[in-house]
Regions:
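ATP-binding/phosphotransfer module of carbohydrate and carboxylate kinases, centering on a glycine-rich
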Residues: 2-145
Length: 145
């Protein structure tokens, strides 16, 4: 969508810019800046984070919900493209955003299913059981063999 901000990796238009914890907060920030008259409880938050956006979305804040929906749409649609080629059984959502639970996975699943109706089986969007600790376990496994 004509992304002008550079991603942490140095690229532009990366999925990470929208479909991640930092992406959710970034999208909310952009929405707040785009319409200064639009009401949102997020205007009172000093350090905007994915958690604050997700909490506001759960509480019914429409701007926060738009940010979350946009992030889930990008991720769900990207997964749908992968599903049509690879046909996986499941996708695991981990990291910090996994704490949002089914509030996120149900939205991601809905967007995924919109664009993958021809897949031989429906890939499930699930929560990784290790949550934000997955990286630590992976690093330990590499070191310990």
């Amino acid at each position: 969508e004509g992304e002008t901000e550079q991603c942490n990796c140095g690229g532009y238009g990366c999925l990470e810019q929208a479909a991640s914890a930092t992406g959710i907060a970034r999208l909310a920030r952009k929405l707040l800046e785009a319409d200064l008259a639009r009401p949102s409880s997020l205007r009172e938050v000093k350090n905007l984070s994915a958690k604050s956006v997700l909490d506001a979305a759960r509480a019914g804040d429409l701007l926060a919900l738009e940010s979350v929906e946009t992030s889930c749409r990008y991720l769900g649609w990207a997964m749908a493209g992968i599903t049509m080629v690879v046909d996986p059984e499941a996708y695991l959502i981990g990291g910090g955003v996994s704490r949002a639970g089914t509030f996120l996975t149900e939205k991601i699943q809905r967007y995924h299913d919109q664009l993958s109706p021809m897949a031989t089986k429906k890939a499930k969007v699930l929560l990784a059981t290790l949550g934000n600790d997955a990286g630590i376990y992976g690093a330990a496994k590499l070191v310990l063999g």
